């Protein structure tokens, strides 16, 4: 065989993990007359059964789950799951929900894929630099609402509505993490 090195072992472990089929991997070393034999003990991902979604309001559970087009009754592949996460996040972004993220995705032993979404909820508004009118005159023009997911398209419309009031030379939105 090959000469044993820690770097080689690390490369092997990474290559096996990168296949996406295993959630745990443990090398076992066995002394043989020729040197060391490495036996890899793998723990396969569970067999996929269904997707369970939480934290979503913009897209319903069925719509979110539809992005996870995994084959029921087959072993889940983490690479496929990660591609599904990317497609879902892109769907949110293309609809203006630029702060939405999948914050957790994991497989339960029973084959349930748990997906947690944070849609980037608006926690409130602060009006700064306003001396020409009451703040509520500005905030009533906001298409964004406290407690709803932030939407860049609605934010642009809101800025335009505030600008159209005629009180301000410039209107912009600054996002501050909550």
Regions found by a protein language model. Name each.
Residues 1-178:
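Periplasmic polypeptide-binding modules associated with outer-membrane biogenesis and secretion
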